Amino acid sequence: AAAARAPAARDLLRIPAPAVRDPVPAGADLGVADVEPWLTPADDFYRIDTALSVPRIDVDAWELRLHGMVERELTLRFDDLTARPLLERIVTLACVSNPVGGDLVGNAVWTGVPIRDLLAEAGPSAEADMVLSTSEDGFTASTPLEALTDPGRDSLLAVTMNGEPLPFEHGYPVRMVVPGLYGYVSATKWVVDLEVTRFDRAEAYWTSRGWTARGPIKMSSRIEVPAEGGRTEAGPAVLAGTAWAQHTGIAAVQVSVDEGPWQDAELGSVGTDDTWRQWVLRADLPGGRHTARVRAVDRDGTVQTAEPAPPAPDGASGWHERTFTVA
């Protein structure tokens, strides 16, 4: 019965407006054809999880327990959660299994309650260093406690995505959103339990399978235009894409064509350090076949590594390349 009521309840759900908004900056989307939009529509947002079927949770029956190495356990219903001041944040999420140049990354507007506020009420032990989150479907993630309590990192128990209640496939009614960490250690959907513990006492779903425990997102950039093997018009040729360095921010994107000098691309406006940035380079290229590669530079001055690495165990690295023809 609860599952049957869930779709109707979601359609009728009214969530209070956020007390703090995060507006989309003018100029963030450069409007280049065939580049992923700066804000990813929910229907196009990547989905990676372990659920064999998407949970259909009755919002009236949903409950979150926060317990473990704390002074006070908390139990919250959905109305308890949304009665608190809600915070709106635009955050780019990425999957650790995303290959170089891959599309398992997206940027959305999330609204929710800062997890640090709930943890402050619960009072974590000084010995605790991890929060083990559990999904309705049994999935677990191990998130560094410091990432959830950091006042400069708005980790959320999110209840909306792009201004609407969370889609079922993206965690309705409540999910975690933690800037700067890969989803396998932070982005628990359909979350029902938060246990404050230690990394040496508990192990999560993917870390028990050999993936690293803390999961910071690696700086990445990709070429989206032109397509691999595609054709582009001369005068000048347009190369464009997206770059991200969550919780540090992108300062520059550079492109090299045919192993030539690195050229600085034009960047879209800055959202926050937790969002990706679009880039575009217009280059005068002779007709024929060309290969371009891209790299990013973060706000600390670190240049994206060229060293190739596979997604396992802590995320892919290397420069993305595209081969194309100028007509």
Question: What are these regions, as identified by a protein language model?
Answer:
Residues 7-327:
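Structured, non-membrane catalytic/scaffold regions adjacent to prosthetic-group chemistry
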